[in-house]
């Protein structure tokens, strides 16, 4: 038997509420496992990074985006296409400097924190959605861009919005990542 030609792969989606509740349970378990918020934040970032390195392939296959020629194009693709595709939201984009390598994604609604009213007592340094920073950083690294991705504001910490800061550091050496023939 052979595979049918030109059949598009099926993409399975899970219920958003199930994903958000499962993520909440994961963060709660990490808070039990690690005493320091910094350790939980580091673990969430590492998990996100690993997800981002794999998610970028799915994103590029499904979105059919063309090659970007500037950091602002990349940020707009992340905000308008990637966030919409995977989280169902479109964050606002702002640029912070004249060299156009520092940007912010402003999330007026954060789906990962939908069922969270406040951070647990004694966990003021916890970045509940640090997974997102890791995902963005991992995906950017896979397209040869080093970036620093951090939370600048967080609704769960009393801010009016959730803001993710992205600073593009440099383009990575593509030769290092090419497959050897």
Swiss-Prot record:
**In the record, which residues receive a covalent lipid, type S-palmitoyl cysteine?**
68
Q: What's a GO cellular component annotated to this UniProt protein?
A: TRAPP complex
Q: Which family does it belong to?
A: Belongs to the TRAPP small subunits family. BET3 subfamily.
Where mainly located? Golgi
Query: Pfam families under this entry?
Result: TRAPP
Q: Which GO terms describe its biological process?
A: Golgi vesicle transport
Q: What does this protein do?
A: May play a role in vesicular transport from endoplasmic reticulum to Golgi.
Instruction: Supply the source organism for this entry.
Output: Mus musculus (Mouse)
**Protein's name in the database:** Trafficking protein particle complex subunit 3-like protein
| Subunit structure, as described in the record | Homodimer. Component of the multisubunit TRAPP (transport protein particle) complex, which includes at least TRAPPC2, TRAPPC2L, TRAPPC3, TRAPPC3L, TRAPPC4, TRAPPC5, TRAPPC8, TRAPPC9, TRAPPC10, TRAPPC11 and TRAPPC12.
This protein's source sits in the domain of life called Eukaryota
Q: Where in the cell is it found?
A: Golgi apparatus, cis-Golgi network; Endoplasmic reticulum
Has UniProt tagged this entry with the keyword Lipoprotein? yes
Q: Please name the PANTHER family in this protein's record.
A: TRAFFICKING PROTEIN PARTICLE COMPLEX SUBUNIT 3
Annotated keywords: Endoplasmic reticulum, ER-Golgi transport, Golgi apparatus, Lipoprotein, Palmitate, Transport
**What InterPro entries does the record tag this protein with?**
Bet3 (IPR016721), NO_sig/Golgi_transp_ligand-bd (IPR024096), TRAPP_component (IPR007194)
